[in-house]
Design a protein with these regions (language model features):
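Intrinsic-disorder/low-complexity, polar/charged segments enriched in Ser/Thr/Lys/Arg/Asp/Glu/Gln
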Residues: 4-6, 31-33, 64
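C-terminal edge-of-domain segments
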Residues: 56-70
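Short glycine-rich, basic-tinged beta-strand/loop micro-motifs
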Residues: 25-37
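Amphipathic alpha-helical interaction surfaces in cytosolic regulatory modules
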Residues: 16-23, 39-52
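An N-terminal amphipathic alpha-helical segment
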Residues: 1-28
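Short, structured interface segments that constitute the first stable element of a domain
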Residues: 1-2, 36, 41
Length: 70
């Protein structure tokens, strides 16, 4: 089983979640799990993943969204 890097960006204002995600994708070749609060942040993280040639899968959580980038 592969350890998954987690970026907890809940409660942060844009563009912080995107910047933290970009940094994690730059440093991690494996999967990255990003936690965000707002729907537009989820969409931005998914778009960033797609732009980097990675696949993103989102699920709604109690306090926002979890986006797993592979």
């Amino acid at each position: 089983m592969t350890d998954m890097k987690e970026v907890d960006a809940r409660g942060l204002s844009c563009p912080e979640p995107l910047m933290l995600t970009a940094e994690a994708l730059k440093n991690e070749k494996g999967p990255v799990r990003v936690l965000v609060t707002e729907p537009h942040q989820r969409m931005n993280v998914e778009k960033l993943a797609k732009d980097r040639g990675r696949k993103a899968t989102s699920t709604e959580t109690e306090d926002g969204f979890a986006v797993v980038i592979e």
